[in-house]
Design a protein with these regions (language model features):
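Terminal low-complexity, poorly structured segments
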Residues: 41, 55, 101-102
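Generic structural motif
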Residues: 14-16, 56
Length: 114
């Protein structure tokens, strides 16, 4: 029998804050994915949101609304969340949530240039 121990990172927890426009972005995504999106954001961004991983990276240039980071998740990394970290308030501000279809990124149902 193999036992795998998993420990949570001991970093401080960040509060997740959503920009008002994000509500419209989520409405453009099929409802069956809403819980996956919420769970992924909470699991991956509350602790160490500014540590680069395989699916989380700093943006070379801000894509939308001043976002400095992107996280990818879901089936085939279909979903994208763009955010910035506010260290003073210990908050992660979610600025946009999109869906990648082929080479197109759709945010709020509108194509956005990468």
């Amino acid at each position: 029998m193999t036992i795998i121990m998993v420990t949570m990172p001991s970093g401080k927890r960040f509060e997740i804050v959503y920009a008002p426009i994000v509500k419209q972005h989520v409405k453009a995504i099929d409802r069956k994915h809403h819980s996956l999106i919420k769970e992924a954001i909470e699991a991956q961004l509350q602790v160490e949101p500014d540590v680069e991983t395989r699916n989380r990276r700093p943006l070379k240039r801000p894509v939308t609304l001043g976002a400095k980071w992107e996280i990818r998740f879901g089936p085939h990394n279909r979903f994208r969340v763009f955010y910035k970290v506010n260290y003073d308030d210990e908050q992660v501000e979610i600025l946009a949530i999109g869906e990648k279809e082929g080479s197109q990124l759709l945010i709020g149902g509108e194509e956005v240039a990468l």
